[in-house]
Amino acid sequence: MRIAVAGGTGTVGHHAVEAARERGHEVVVLTRSNGIDLVSGEGLDDALRGVDVVIDASNLITTSAKKATEFFTTVTRNLLAAEQRAGVRHHVSLSIVGIDRAPYGYYAAKLAQERAVEAGGVPWTILRAMQFHEFAGQLLEGLTIAGVHLAPRVRTQPIAAREVGQRLVELAEGAPMGHAPEIAGPRQEQLADMIRTLAHATGVKGPVMAISLPGKQYAAMRRGETLPGPGATIGHQTFDEWVAEQASVTQR
């Protein structure tokens, strides 16, 4: 099978590329370095020639709801239009658990992406995943004021990005199924505890302070409204196991 991966160098996308190659598929990585611009659509027609399935794990890190919505809807429509021209049979899109239950600009953008996929004319599968273990590291780096690391008090059920990438490939190998069962890690965690654990394991200096961030999004997360529902696919690697794995790699 010939599989194209948008966002194929990202947190999940590079794992999807690895998994697809390990399973014997021919992989096309849709990146600017390969002459493909997802936002303008440049290079997509040539890249998707002969492709059977497209996995979209593309992402934009932004706090602007407008920018996020423009990015996800534009990229999705460009992909779907090029897929129709190329005769692609299946579009697999990565989304997030709970985006319809927590009011947040980025989540609204992902919902808009889902609607574009549903209306796009290419048979589709959408996989909603929980936050990745790597999310704790992003917050550890990004939420720091005067040497103090701020850790939001929220509940999550994080999953290894590698397992999400593998699941995307499994779905790509099957028939389009609409909304696939959500995917989450094996254990619920407090995000503040995750950040403390990672800081200790990686030698990050400075105190970690748990805080209750304002806003309806964080209130919904504290209440557990963005946790997976019944029937979710449950991964294997816990956050603690992932941290130990990262520490082992660093020490080599």
Predicted segment positions?
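NAD(P)H-binding glycine-rich loop region in Rossmannoid oxidoreductase-like domains
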Residues: 21-86, 96-101
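N-terminal Rossmann NAD(P)H-binding glycine-rich loop of SDR-like oxidoreductase domains
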Residues: 1-25
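Glycine-rich Rossmann NAD(P)(H)-binding loop
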Residues: 150-155, 181-188
